[in-house]
Amino acid sequence: MAVMPFSPDQIIRPEILALSAYHVPPACGMIKLDAMENPYPLPPELRDEIAKLAGETPVNRYPDPDAAALKAALREALSIPDGMDIMLGNGSDEIIQIIALACGKPGAVLMSVEPAFVMFRMIATFASMNYVGVPLHPDFSLDAEAMLAAIARYQPAVIFIAYPNNPTGNLFDAVEISRIIDAAPGVVVVDEAYHAFADASFMDKLAHHPNLLLMRTLSKLGMAGLRLGLLAGKPEWLRQLEKLRLPYNVGIVTQRIAEKLLQHRDVLLQQAAAIKLERSSMSRRLAELEGIEVFPTDANFILFRLNQDHKATQVFQELKQRGILVKNLDGAHPLLKNCLRVTVGMPDENAQFLEVLQTLLVKVEAKA
């Protein structure tokens, strides 16, 4: 009997076939200013403690499925309010996916602003939810009236709001976010991935809004390689979401090392303070360059737009050829036309980036 040819296209959902996989560019040997990581290494003595701890960790055993010790450390370090529960994820991405899967009834809508964190849209597709993106104002401020109108029209099951926003870096007006939370018929998740670099939070609002959840990650604070995200909220929400969390999703090495680093949170906060100082200096120096518009930021990155004499894609490629990797956002959304995003690195990395960028801009002007 002849065997019929088999194709995954016959089985896999068409909306998945239409997706492109999330691309992470190779960065070996480059100045890496594209992924919003903390660039500072840990002090040698702390690295030695972690190496010893890793060596003593029983990796042949499954981790604590509840990560009780780590949760206790996080509750204290992040000032989680009394009465609120915590759920941990393998990075924030897993938490976003759990929420979407839990709320993804047939025809349900997941809403966010645009431009926003790309995983909101992608995970809505993964979970068979309809995605609605509401454009920001041209200055990247929140269009609260448009959001409220979209809420009334689409009745979203889930709304994600990043605070500060990625990729724009700005903090939206807190009063307007509260209006959105009050108007939402479903759950509102405030994503505070960049909280370490901002001076605002909705953590103390959790008790005041029955439909509010708050998400954090330790990636930007210096633990990107550990992949650890956190969701805080009322127990009645988290009890349901826990049903979708896969067993042992936070590995034993991640649990042990994260606990150790939280005991030395002062080191991480000092590094965050250094990044904020560099951010101010870098924003100022970028703004001094001819042909660049720099946008306000409360994150560990800076969004800037090149004027019409320069092409963002060309500048991105030339920076890359010179060993500097930033994020090219031109084409990602109409509001991001000719925009690049640069992570705040260490002082010498930032200086090299600025020097090369200035050289490239001058070269283009000379040709004009």
From Swiss-Prot:
Keyword terms of this UniProt record: Amino-acid biosynthesis, Aminotransferase, Histidine biosynthesis, Pyridoxal phosphate, Transferase
Protein EC: 2.6.1.9
GO MF entries: histidinol-phosphate transaminase activity; pyridoxal phosphate binding
Location of N6-(pyridoxal phosphate)lysine modifications: K220
InterPro entries associated with the record: Aminotransferase_I/II_large (IPR004839), HisP_aminotrans (IPR005861), PyrdxlP-dep_Trfase (IPR015424), PyrdxlP-dep_Trfase_major (IPR015421), PyrdxlP-dep_Trfase_small (IPR015422)
Top-level division of the source organism's lineage: Bacteria
Pathway: Amino-acid biosynthesis; L-histidine biosynthesis; L-histidine from 5-phospho-alpha-D-ribose 1-diphosphate: step 7/9
Entry cofactors: pyridoxal 5'-phosphate
Alphabetical GO biological process terms: L-histidine biosynthetic process
Catalytic activity annotation: L-histidinol phosphate + 2-oxoglutarate = 3-(imidazol-4-yl)-2-oxopropyl phosphate + L-glutamate
Subunit-structure text: Homodimer.
Similarity comment: Belongs to the class-II pyridoxal-phosphate-dependent aminotransferase family. Histidinol-phosphate aminotransferase subfamily.
Protein name, entry field: Histidinol-phosphate aminotransferase 1
Lineage: Bacteria, Pseudomonadati, Pseudomonadota, Betaproteobacteria, Nitrosomonadales
